[in-house]
Swiss-Prot record:
The lineage of its organism: Bacteria, Pseudomonadati, Pseudomonadota, Alphaproteobacteria, Hyphomicrobiales. Its EC number is 5.3.1.6. Catalyzes the reversible conversion of ribose-5-phosphate to ribulose 5-phosphate. This is Ribose-5-phosphate isomerase A. Keywords: Isomerase. SUPFAM superfamilies: D-ribose-5-phosphate isomerase (RpiA), lid domain (SSF75445), NagB/RpiA/CoA transferase-like (SSF100950). Homodimer. Substrate binds at T28, G29, S30, T31, D83, G84, A85, D86, K96, G97, G98, G99, K123. Belongs to the ribose 5-phosphate isomerase family. The gene is rpiA. It comes from the Bacteria.
Length: 232
């Protein structure tokens, strides 16, 4: 079973948690897109959902496939969000934002009664940090913000390269008009401390650490998909 097949298996199991008539947050990224395709097949057969996308990219795919959408202002309280992750640990602390939608993903997740994370087994790790941590920043004073992040990380014993994300020859820009710094710390032993330190920096809009937000994870491997609940 290749990685895409694993993603499909995870999406299939996650879809079983979606009930007819739900207000559904819909995530961003390659695994979330497999979920959208499967959801669209059910919608075509008469299944009812009201979807809230976490990015313009997800919105375009949903509209293309016929998944009905509303804005979060129209549906400010959601029953469930299904989204992917770039990394997750056994506590279901996540690194997200590889697709550049971390701010909207976090807002939608916070508005949801439950959050299900879908991933292939390569994303499940003992300690977060091998995947670079996305940090969304304001365009004003970006260098000063990066220096502040480096200093805050150093106080926590973290070091590594922190660089602006590019899109071809241009700086990558989020749907909200911000930039992203990708921080390659290698290992993040205390996600809570890092989260607090980053939130204290004025130029940081949001970061890709999702702590205590996931209700469960559906992780697929070569032997199929399984449900993982957070370890206290």
């Amino acid at each position: 079973m290749d990685v895409r097949q694993m993603k499909i298996k995870a999406a299939e199991l996650a879809l079983s948690y979606v009930e007819n008539g739900m207000r559904l947050g819909i995530g961003t990224g390659s695994t979330a897109e497999e979920f959208v395709r499967l959801l669209a097949e059910k919608v075509a057969d008469g299944f009812k959902v009201q979807g809230v996308p976490t990015s313009e990219r997800t919105a375009r795919l949903c509209l293309e496939l016929g998944v009905p959408l509303m804005s979060l202002d129209e549906l400010p309280e959601l029953d469930l969000t299904v989204d992917g992750a770039d990394e997750l640990d056994r506590h279901l602390t996540l690194i997200k934002g590889g697709g550049g939608a971390l701010l909207r993903e976090k807002i939608v997740a916070a508005a949801s009664s439950r959050v299900i994370v879908i991933a292939d087994e390569t994303k499940l790790v003992e300690t977060l940090g091998a995947y670079p941590l996305p940090i969304e920043i304001n365009g004003f004073g970006g260098i000063a913000t990066r220096i502040s992040i480096e200093k805050a990380a150093a106080k926590l014993g973290l070091s590594g390269t922190i660089g602006l994300r590019m899109s071809g020859d241009d700086l990558f820009m989020t749907d909200g008009g911000h930039y992203i710094l990708d921080a390659s710390f290698g290992r993040i032993p205390d996600a809570v401390a890092l989260s607090q330190a980053l939130h204290a920096i004025p130029g940081v809009v949001e970061h890709g650490l999702f702590i205590g937000m996931a209700s469960l994870a559906v992780v697929a491997g070569s032997d199929g998909a399984r449900v993982i609940e957070p370890v206290a």
